[in-house]
């Protein structure tokens, strides 16, 4: 695959999303694997509360009208990156189309070499409070 291939294992979500958005706007194709292993920093209860509030937003008259927020790990990561792109401009939408996010590693990418974003590496946090995206996803889906 052409472009950049990123392993999301132990990457900080916001920092990774910022870097990926810059790559996308520069015209590169970006593929992220292991989206479920991306981490979010902060107090677990506050993170749950913030994301649950987002997913509970709906039109009271007709809840099928949205807004819609993702509940699966790959979609949570993808939506976070979308928030860092100029979504209402054609350049932002074109950049968003160049993004692929997967849970785990797809069979077609088994032998591919993945890069790590140094600025977003979660190993530098030490014992800081963190939450993995798969834990957040299980909470949002009620599992």
What are these regions (language model features)?
Residues 1-143:
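Ribosome-associated RNA-binding proteins
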């Amino acid at each position: 695959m052409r472009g950049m291939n990123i392993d999301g294992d132990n990457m900080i979500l916001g920092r990774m999303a910022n870097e990926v958005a810059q790559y996308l706007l520069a015209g590169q194709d970006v593929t992220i694997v292991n989206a479920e292993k991306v981490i979010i920093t902060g107090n677990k209860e506050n993170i749950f509360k913030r994301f649950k509030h987002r997913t509970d937003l709906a039109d009271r008259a007709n809840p099928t009208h949205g807004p819609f927020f993702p509940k699966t790990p790959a979609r949570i990561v993808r939506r976070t990156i979308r928030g860092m792109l100029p979504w209402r401009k054609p350049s932002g939408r074109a950049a968003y189309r160049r993004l692929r996010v997967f849970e785990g590693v797809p069979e077609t990418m088994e032998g591919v070499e993945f890069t790590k974003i140094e600025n977003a590496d979660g190993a530098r946090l030490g014992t800081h409070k963190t939450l993995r995206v798969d834990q957040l996803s299980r909470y949002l889906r009620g599992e």
